[in-house]
Amino acid sequence: MSRTSNGIFVALLLASPIGEARAAAAPVKALVGGTLIDGFGGPPIQDSVVIVDGERIRAVGTVATLAVPEGAEVISTEGMSVLPGLWDMHVHVMINGHADYVHWDETYPDRFRDVIMPASAHQLLMAGVTSARDLGGPLEDSIAVRDAVNRGEIPGPTLYVSGPFIQHRPYPGTELFRWGVEGVDDARAKVRRLAEAGVDVVKLIDQDQMTVDEVHAVVDEAHRHGLTVVAHAHRPEEIRRGLAAGVDCFEHTGLSTAPEYPPDVIAAIRERTAQMNRGPLFWTPTVEGLYNYTYLRDNPEKLDGDEWHLGLPEEIVLDIRRSIAHPDRLPYFQATPARKPTLRRKIDQLRESGVQLLIGTDSGIPMKFHIDSTWNELDIWVRVMGIEPMEAIRSATYWPALAMGVADDVGTVTEGKLADIIAVKGDVLRYIDKLDDVDIVLKHGVRHK
């Protein structure tokens, strides 16, 4: 059916008694007039109309082809870009920009569930992030906050949580959210415990410090329970072992100052991406935090905005401020200026090797606030890494939904899918940084901004 005939059909349906009854029975919204970037990568739809009925999208068309139901709440998107809600595939809602991890981990565990994690979730939503993958947190707190968001008790994106990291040995003082494994049986038992608790994904790190059999056990057990596995890619051996074990998605572009990935690693990646029967190999490079560090160091007033205070008590805000008072002194970033020049080459290598990149930010790490990390990552991809805006947007919408196995429900603005939609004044395909100030946020049909 053509878009025009489909629009006429919808208009007739809505004008019928059945259509009128449906409109009266459920809250209906109509986003009218904007340029729709639907997530599929095709030409934007000018003068778009998106009809939202309850939590789902009822119809998509144009002003010329799709009538607005009588009594619907009309939301003008004239002069705006309309997009699927953004995904951030690598966040840490248990932290919020504080620079001293030891202090944070000792001071705030009893405030994670009720204060800090809800504040982080709310900030992400206000930034236009309607879905996020939370990679590393206390198990019970992560599940509780995810479920509270899903029940509508906490404003936030739909969260896909990993719970604790799985690794060889937890760093001292981090046992609450890092689980060590000792042998194959223990590796499988830890993953089963996560699966039975209801996590959405398993996060594996430091796999180069584990035995090969342990790494395979983690991945195999996760897959047995229908869970994808993400793994760190800081060091070449982490990548080698992860690929051999069947890791689904790698995180980061490495903390080394090596100018590029070794040839054998690239060859192994290409071997994996050639096996399309296994689906795409996903990779979340998280480059913005490294790339923008020197800018923040030299322009610390950029940290003075109060947007990242949302939901945080004043004493926590002051504690965070104190921790980042001297950006140039932070141990976390001392090697970053030497890493920065390697990022473009590594991104190019990954793209040339057939990897599907995903937008993710490591949001929550020192000076990386949930309120603005995601648009900054998109901006760096386009402005510095040479990635086309449409490709970057699809890496924050369509591809993450596919990676998480939920593309039937989210990731594009399509009839029948959940109404996760954002709108922003201006043309984001020309000026991607317009996403720094999202004007409209709908999640599951509820307007939050």
Regions found by a protein language model. Give the residues of each.
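Bacterial N-terminal signal peptides
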Residues: 7-17
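Histidine-rich, glycine-flanked metal-binding segment
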Residues: 36, 40-83
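Divalent metal-coordination and catalytic microenvironments
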Residues: 34, 50, 55, 79, ...
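Divalent metal-dependent hydrolysis catalytic cores, especially in the metallo-beta-lactamase
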Residues: 117-140, 157-164, 197-207, 228, ...
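Metal-associated gating/positioning segment near the N- to mid-region
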Residues: 80-148, 172, 213, 234-252
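Active-site core of metal-dependent hydrolases
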Residues: 204-339, 358, 365, 385-386, ...
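His/Asp/Glu-enriched, well-ordered alpha-helical/loop segment
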Residues: 224, 328-332, 340-427
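Acidic/histidine-rich helix-loop elements
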Residues: 93-112, 168-185, 254-260, 328-335
